[in-house]
A protein has these predicted regions:
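Alpha-helical transmembrane segments in eukaryotic/viral proteins
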Residues: 112-139
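Short, Gly/Pro- and small/polar-rich lid/capping loops
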Residues: 129-155
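Noncatalytic, helix-rich "gating/capping" subdomain that lines the substrate-entry/channel surface
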Residues: 201-566, 620-626, 633
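Intrinsically disordered, low-complexity linker/terminal regions across diverse proteins
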Residues: 366, 375, 385, 406, ...
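Helix-loop boundary elements of multi-pass alpha-helical membrane proteins
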Residues: 85-120
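Intrinsic disorder
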Residues: 20, 47, 52-55
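Active-site-surrounding "flap" and adjacent substrate/cofactor-binding loops of secreted or lumenal enzymes
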Residues: 145-146, 162-165, 170-236
Length: 867
C-alpha cells in the first residue's frame, strides 16, 4: 500500500523598483513511499518548481544539490526535477503499536525537515529574485547602433574557440572571411577600412558641383586642386614640362651630365629642403626648444624619409621599409631576395631616366645625349645613385638610436654653426688627411632663410644638434664623393617623388615597380580616389569643412570629454596605488596628467570662414597645373615654419596635430596634448550603443594616448612639455626594471620568420597595456554614476565587463599575409593580433571577467604592469 502526501506552498516574490512586479507560484510535491510490513528505502524527495511568470520572463534554474545558478541554459517547457536520495537501512517493525508510534515520529520528523527545506527554498528563491530578477528584466538595447555592433561582433567571432585559449581567434576568427584584403593592399583592418571609406566620401564631396558663393575660398581651392589632378588629358599634354619647371626652381639640371652645371650641391640640398621639405643627407627643422617650448630653435638631426606628395601613408611607410630592408640584405645573406628587389629598383630607375632623357617620347635621343643614353653608361650612372643611397641608409640605421634624450641633452648640444663646422672638419681630416672638408652648415642654413628671415648665426641663433656623430659621418661621406655624383643623387631624389604625379607613362612605370617590390596590385587604382587622397593630404582642413558635421561638437564632444575625464581620473587612481613610485614622482606625474590638454573632433575655428581662408593664405591654384599646385601648397606651409624661428610660441586651440579626417589619434609630447580627430569617432571605434562597448573601443584608444605621456619617450617631458628630468633617480630605476618585463614578454612572440622586437615596440606596448587598464577603471566610474546599462541583443549571456573586452578585441581584428607580417616587424607597433593577445595576457581583469583558469594560455602566472 502506498500513500502520497502533497504540500503546496505559495511564494510571493516582490522585486525592487526598476524590475517587474508579479506573483510566482511554486508547488513542492513531496512523495514518501513505504509498504505496511517494513520500510523500504525512503529514497525520493522531489521538488517540482514551476515558475509562472509575467511579461515573458524566462525562469532560471537553481539546483539545490549542486548549487550553481545557470544563466546560460535555454528555457525548457517541462518541469525541472531535483532529487535528494537516502539509502539508509531501517529496522523492521515488531508490533502494531510500535509501528504506529514509529510512523508518527517519522511523519513528524519528515514534516519538520520538509518545512525547513521549504523555508530554505523560499529564502533562496527570494534572494535569487533580488539578485537576478533585475537582470532577467533588464531592457535589451534595440537601437540601430546596438544592433549594428552586435551583428559585427557576431560575424567576426569564432565561438568554437575557447576564449581562455586564444581570445584573438575567439573574437576575430571569422573577421578575415568577412573583410578580405583588397587587391591594392597586403593587409586589412578596421583602421584601413574606415580610412578608405573616408577617402570615398571625400572623393564624392569633391566631385559635387559647387559655386564660389556657396563655400569658403579655401574650399574652392581644394576643389581646384582636385580638378587639376583629375585632368589626365592636360597632365599628359604637358608631359615632362611641369617636372622640368620644378627642377629649375630647385636649381637642379633637367638631365644630369648633359645640362651645364650652375650651382653646387649644398645650394641644391637647401633648395630641396626650403621648397619641398625633403631631407636627403641630413634632417633640418625649426622646432620648439625642448628645454623651453615658448621659443623656437634650429635643429639638425638624422634625415626623416618622407614624401610630401604621396597619398597612401601605409604604402609610403612600406616602401621605405622595403628599401631599408633591401639595403640590409647584404647582412642577411639572402642573395635571391637581394637580386630580385635590387633588379626591380634598378630597372625602375633606368626606365624613368630613359624616359626623361628621351623627353617623354619614343623618339631616339639627339646626338648630344647619345653617350649617356647608351645602356652601359646609364647602368653605371644608376648604380652610382644606388650605391650612395646604400651608404646613407646604412649610416642612418647605425646612428638612429643615438639621438638626444633627457639623459644626454646638455648645453653643449646647443652650438654655433661655425663651431659645428670645425668639429666636422676636424673629424674629416683625422679620418683621412688627403680629404678636403666641405663647408656645409652655414651655407645650407643661410640659403634656406635667404629672403625669409634675418639670422644671427654668429651669436644669437644657435643650432641644436640631434646626433653629432651622425653629422660627422655625413661630413666625411660628402668629402669622399665628387660634387657631380652628389648632385646626381639630389636630382634623382626629387625625380623619384614626382614620378607618381607626372604623365600616365611615368605613373605606369611607378605602379609596375611598386607592385613588384610590395606584392600589392596598384595598377588598377581609382584615379578619383587617388586625387581625393592627394587633396586630403595637402588641404585637409578645407576638406574637413565639407566632411565634418557642424553640429558634431553639440552631439558628441561632451560624451567624449566625459570619457576622457574618466580615463584621466582612472590613471590618477592607478598611479596613486603604485608601490614603486615615490611620493615626489607620484605628485609630479598626477600634475602632468591634470595639465594634459585635448582637442576633440575639429578645431573650433574650422567653420570660421575668415580663419579657414587665412590658414591657406598665399596659395593661388590653377585647374591646369597639377604638379605646380602641390609644390605651391607645400612651399607656402614651409614658409610659415621658417618665419616662425624668432616668434614666441603660443599654443592654443588653433594647434592641431593632424587633420580632422584622420582615422587615428595623437599625443604631442612637447605640448602635453592629445588630438582626437572626428575621423576616428565613428563605427567601430565609437557610437556603439553601450558605454561598455565605447569604453572598450575608443576608451582604450584615449587611454593609449594619455599613457604615451608616460611611456619611455613621454616621461622625459614634464607637464609643460619641456625636456628635463622631473622623476627621481630611484623611480627611474624602478620604471626601467618594470619596462624590461614588457620587453621580455613581447620578445617571445614569433611571427613568420622572426620574433617581435620588444625594445622597438616598447613605447606602444606600454601605451596599449596602460590604455586598457585605464578604460576598465574608467567604465566602472561611469557605471557608478549612471547605473547598469541594457543588454546587447544576441549577447544577453555576457556581462558588460565581458563586452568591454570583446569590443577591445574587435578593434584589432585584421587580415594579413605572410609578406605583410614581415613589413610589420619593422614597425614600432606590433601586429594587431599580437597587440591584443599580449595586452590581455597581462590583464588580471580580463582573466577574472572570462573565468580563465590560472596557468591557461590567456592567464599566465607572470604578468607585466606599470600602473
Amino acid at each position: 500500500m502506498f500513500r502520497r502526501y502533497r504540500v503546496s506552498v505559495i511564494i510571493h516574490r516582490s522585486v525592487t523598483r526598476g524590475c517587474y512586479r508579479g506573483w510566482s507560484e511554486g508547488k513542492i510535491d513531496v512523495t514518501t513511499t513505504y509498504d505496511k510490513n517494513h520500510w523500504e528505502n525512503v529514497n525520493v524527495w522531489t521538488f517540482d518548481v514551476v515558475c509562472l511568470t509575467r511579461l515573458g520572463v524566462q525562469c532560471r534554474q537553481f539546483d539545490p544539490v549542486s548549487g550553481p545558478f545557470s544563466m546560460n541554459n535555454e528555457r525548457k517547457n517541462e518541469g525541472s526535477v531535483y532529487s535528494v536520495g537516502s539509502q539508509n537501512h531501517l529496522v523492521p517493525i515488531r508490533s502494531r503499536k510500535t509501528f504506529f508510534k514509529k510512523k508518527s515520529q517519522i511523519s513528524n520528523l519528515l514534516l519538520i525537515i520538509l518545512f525547513v527545506l521549504v523555508g530554505a527554498l523560499s529564502i533562496t528563491v527570494m534572494i535569487l529574485a533580488v539578485l537576478y530578477g533585475c537582470k532577467n528584466m533588464m531592457k535589451i538595447c534595440d537601437s540601430e547602433d546596438c544592433v549594428r555592433i552586435a551583428a559585427s561582433l557576431k560575424e567576426s567571432m569564432n565561438e568554437s574557440v575557447n576564449p581562455c585559449d586564444d581570445f584573438y581567434q575567439y573574437a576575430c576568427g571569422r573577421w578575415p572571411q568577412e573583410h578580405p584584403i583588397p587587391d591594392s593592399s597586403l593587409t586589412n583592418s578596421w583602421f584601413s577600412e574606415r580610412s578608405n571609406r573616408m577617402y570615398r566620401k571625400i572623393r564624392d564631396l569633391l566631385m559635387v558641383n559647387i559655386s564660389a558663393s556657396e563655400v569658403p575660398w579655401a574650399v574652392m581651392q581644394a576643389k581646384t586642386l582636385f580638378t587639376s589632378c583629375m585632368d589626365v588629358y592636360t597632365v599628359n599634354e604637358l608631359n615632362l614640362s611641369p617636372m622640368f619647371d620644378l627642377l629649375k626652381l630647385l636649381n637642379l639640371p633637367m638631365i644630369p651630365l648633359v645640362t651645364k652645371k650652375t650651382t653646387n650641391y649644398i645650394e641644391q640640398l637647401a633648395s630641396v629642403k626650403k621648397i619641398l621639405d625633403l631631407d636627403i643627407f641630413f634632417g633640418f627643422e625649426v622646432i620648439p626648444d625642448p628645454k623651453n617650448k615658448s621659443k623656437n630653435i634650429l635643429y639638425l638631426h638624422l634625415p626623416i624619409r618622407s614624401n610630401p606628395f604621396l597619398t597612401d601613408k601605409e604604402l609610403e611607410k612600406r616602401l621605405q621599409t622595403i628599401r631599408s630592408r633591401l639595403r640590409k640584405l647584404d647582412e642577411l645573406d639572402d642573395e635571391v631576395m637581394l637580386s630580385e628587389n635590387e633588379d626591380a629598383e634598378l630597372i625602375y630607375m633606368v626606365d624613368v631616366i630613359k624616359y626623361i632623357i628621351n623627353n617623354g617620347s619614343d623618339n631616339k635621343c639627339s646626338s648630344d645625349n647619345e653617350s649617356i643614353f647608351e645602356d652601359e653608361v646609364l647602368k653605371d650612372f644608376v648604380k652610382e645613385i644606388y650605391n650612395i643611397s646604400n651608404l646613407f641608409y646604412d649610416m642612418t640605421r647605425a646612428d638612429q638610436n643615438q639621438s638626444i634624450s633627457v639623459e644626454s641633452l646638455s648645453d653643449s648640444d646647443y652650438m654655433l654653426v661655425d663651431d659645428l663646422q670645425k668639429l666636422t672638419d676636424d673629424y674629416v681630416i683625422d679620418s683621412n688627411l688627403s680629404l678636403t672638408p666641405t663647408p656645409i652648415w652655414r651655407p645650407f642654413i643661410e640659403f634656406i632663410f635667404e629672403g625669409i628671415d634675418k639670422l644671427d648665426l654668429d651669436n644669437k641663433d644657435k643650432v641644436l644638434i640631434g646626433n653629432l656623430e651622425y653629422l660627422k659621418d655625413v661630413a666625411l661621406l660628402l668629402a669622399c664623393f665628387e660634387e657631380e655624383a652628389l648632385g646626381i643623387y639630389v636630382w634623382w631624389t626629387v625625380v623619384d617623388i614626382v614620378v607618381p604625379h607626372a604623365s600616365e607613362k611615368l605613373r605606369d612605370i611607378w605602379n609596375k615597380y611598386v607592385s613588384k617590390v610590395t606584392d600589392v596590385e596598384v595598377v588598377g587604382e581609382s584615379k578619383s580616389l587617388f586625387c581625393g587622397s592627394i587633396v586630403n593630404k595637402l588641404m585637409g582642413m578645407a576638406v574637413s569643412w565639407m566632411f565634418v558635421d557642424p553640429t558634431f561638437h553639440e552631439n558628441k564632444v561632451n560624451k567624449v570629454q566625459e570619457m576622457l575625464e574618466d580615463i584621466r581620473e582612472a590613471f590618477g587612481s592607478l598611479v596613486a596605488k603604485t608601490d614603486w613610485m615615490d611620493q615626489l614622482t607620484k605628485t609630479a606625474t598626477l600634475k602632468k596628467s591634470h595639465k594634459m590638454e585635448y582637442e576633440i573632433g575639429f578645431p573650433t575655428w574650422l567653420f570660421n570662414e575668415e580663419k579657414l581662408n587665412e590658414y591657406y593664405e598665399g596659395i593661388d591654384l590653377s585647374e591646369t597645373r597639377y604638379l605646380a599646385n602641390m609644390v605651391q601648397i607645400v612651399q607656402v606651409q614651409l614658409i610659415k615654419t621658417w618665419t616662425s624661428l624668432h616668434d614666441e610660441n603660443i599654443f592654443n586651440e588653433s594647434y592641431w596635430a593632424t587633420d580632422p579626417t584622420d582615422v587615428n589619434a595623437f599625443h604631442t609630447f612637447q605640448l602635453n596634448h592629445i588630438t582626437i580627430p572626428a575621423g576616428i569617432l565613428q563605427f567601430p571605434f565609437y557610437e556603439l550603443g553601450l558605454e561598455a562597448l565605447n569604453y572598450g573601443a575608443i576608451g582604450t584608444v584615449l587611454g593609449h594616448e594619455l599613457t604615451h605621456g608616460f611611456d619611455t619617450s613621454g616621461r622625459l617631458y614634464d607637464g609643460d612639455g619641456n625636456l628635463r628630468q622631473w622623476w627621481t633617480n630611484k623611480t627611474i630605476l624602478e620604471y626601467s626594471d618594470r619596462t624590461q618585463c614588457f620587453i621580455d614578454h613581447y620578445n617571445t612572440y614569433y611571427e613568420v620568420d622572426d620574433y617581435i622586437d620588444g625594445e622597438l615596440t616598447l613605447g606602444e606596448n606600454i601605451a596599449d597595456n596602460g590604455g586598457l587598464r585605464e578604460a576598465i577603471v574608467a567604465y566602472k566610474r561611469w557605471k557608478a554614476r549612471h547605473g547598469h546599462e541594457p543588454l546587447l541583443p544576441g549577447f544577453t549571456q555576457f556581462t558588460h565587463e565581458q563586452l568591454l573586452f570583446l569590443s577591445f578585441a574587435h578593434l584589432w581584428c585584421e587580415s594579413y599575409t605572410a609578406t605583410s607580417l614581415k613589413w610589420m616587424m619593422e614597425d614600432s607597433h606590433c601586429p594587431g593580433h599580437v597587440r591584443l593577445q599580449a595586452v590581455l595576457r597581462n590583464s588580471k581583469e580580463f582573466s577574472t571577467a572570462w573565468n580563465c583558469p590560472a596557468g591557461s594560455t590567456m592567464n599566465p602566472s607572470k604578468k607585466c604592469r606599470l600602473w
